[in-house]
Amino acid sequence: DAVCERYNYEFIRTPIFEASELYHRGVGETSDIVTKETYDFTDRGERKMTLRPEGTAGVVRSYIENKMYGDAKQPIKLYYNGTMYRYERPQSGRDRELTQFGVEVLGSDDPMIDAEVISIAVNIYKMVGLKGIKVNINSLGDKESRDNYRKILIEYFTPYINEMCDDCKNRLEKNPLRILDCKVDGDSNIMKKAPKITDYLNDASRERFERVQKYLDLLDIDYVVNPSIVRGLDYYDHTVFEVEAMVEGFGSQNVLGAGGRYN
């Protein structure tokens, strides 16, 4: 809380369950969260509801419903800390009930905000004493860049269609960028040789990404540009990032925080 308040973020509390449509439309129909991991139920009013699997969609819904975009000074800076639920195979570091801390900035397209959010994550991890902090960043570009890159990916992956897992086969036409997030070992060599989105950004997207990097340099944040990062949710554009750190008992670098812009 102290770090967020230093950056003038205010706490927001959202419901533990929301209308299922919020996550289907907001998080993305092709995301693993929606297709495999949500806890869905029908309430007594015959409404389809979902236990929240992540925090962003509920915050954005609250921003719109409460008209925070109206007379309030922009951007609106919020942070949350709450329980999330995902139906996935329990394993080390992954539980079906988890606590997620996050920050959201709404009402600004300034690349400085991207760097600020990354800086908050790094400062929180430093404050709690984590070592070996590593920041990986990438740009997914604007819609024009992603549409062009989508065509390139379909052309690249099509010859390998019979070698890919079933999930990737389904993603090829719907959202080929999601193929790059595949965790199946047999697909890894195909992914490594795939075209990189950073080579297909248009001038505006490339310039924006360069500005984010300059802001990170000014904030003295060490980072690596990693074109393989696409994140697992469908709403991201432009900057995406992952923050790794050493965690006692795990013995290796672990991704503890991640996020990105969603214009």
Describe the predicted segments one by one.
Residues 1-263:
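TRNA-recognition modules of translation machinery and tRNA-sensing kinases, especially anticodon-binding
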